[in-house]
């Protein structure tokens, strides 16, 4: 498969904001588990039927204006699930992947806030899984957006793309009391040079000591095989996610236009 096969042409995304949020999309959930194996939540993704595109990566890396359209569609799907399945507990906590920079778009924040209020009527917990890969310190505007979201009942999971640098970017959010979870990708635990592994282990253990005092729990993402499971199990992760534990499932077929 070529890069072109994986990445849709930019023009295709321009129609997202104008399309009916109930047309042609499927919502998938991928389980998040506690150390004892209990299902506690789901990482959500949205797939477009006609283009056969998984929007989860798009949500994490899109420019803010396009991210707003993707958020609109995913939240519309999620609301539809809970309107028609009032006893649905399988999704648990709903983790939505989004790039932290997208919170600079007022439309994204307003869409999330409005949806959070609606989901709370169904006793549904919404959590943003915010990808962080910037070197600049967190801006006052960004922290203000986080505060608004948390005050409205939205949980925040920070997802730094590296341990040695980006994890430090989380400290402003942590110090301000604006973080509920810290997510790290299992690829950071992959075997490598001993010095690197020791440095990463010490970084993770240090982060855990820093976070546990503030009741912030750690989540290991994309644990896709037994080796990564063993690595994650040896470290203080409260929750794990990945194909080692389960495959993504379609939350609702959405074959009916009733939503």
UniProtKB/Swiss-Prot annotation:
Positive regulation of toxA gene transcription. It is a peripheral membrane protein. It is found in: Cell inner membrane. One of its GO terms (biological process) is positive regulation of DNA-templated transcription. It holds the Pfam family EAL. It comes from the Bacteria. This is Exotoxin A regulatory protein. One of its GO terms (cellular component) is plasma membrane. Keywords: Activator, Cell inner membrane, Cell membrane, Membrane, Transcription, Transcription regulation. Its main location: membrane.
